Amino acid sequence: DIKSKEDSIAFSRFLEFTDNQLKELATRYPTVKDFWFDGTWDASVKKNGWWTAHAEQMLKELVPGVAINSRLRADDKGKRHFDSNGRLMGDYESGYERRLPDPVKDLKVTQWDWEACMTIPENQWGYHKDWSLSYVKTPIEVIDRIVHAVSMGGNMVVNFGPQADGDFRPEEKAMATAI
């Protein structure tokens, strides 16, 4: 969170750096179809929703037709995924993290494009050396979640965490093969 003048200056530098990185990606890879974001849960981003709207507009101008998930956006009141008026921010909802919509209570989700993001070990994004600290889903459980998402018109993002050399651990390779 931004708590001082120094924080504010540093955050402004971060936004400028991020703008330049996004411009570089959009111009080097003009055929990209989707920009996938994460991080609007951060208080400093939620307080600067103007920048998320700016970034989305900039990318759409640089890459016409590109899709952008709802994890980029925050409105001027700090709302994420959906603005204060209930409108989806982004081209598809990406608010289901490690959970799926309820097939009875959440039927509204079928009115727009959406995705759910899931880890294989609970609460471990990216690479983690030790999987023994948490429950690891079985291939059948992952397939069940994929079927659940697809049956409600959604997409399932399954997190695999590469090692430093870019390879995947044997357990992840076995999981991908089984799926």
Residue ranges and their predicted role:
Residues D1-I179:
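Mature catalytic domains of secreted/periplasmic carbohydrate-active enzymes
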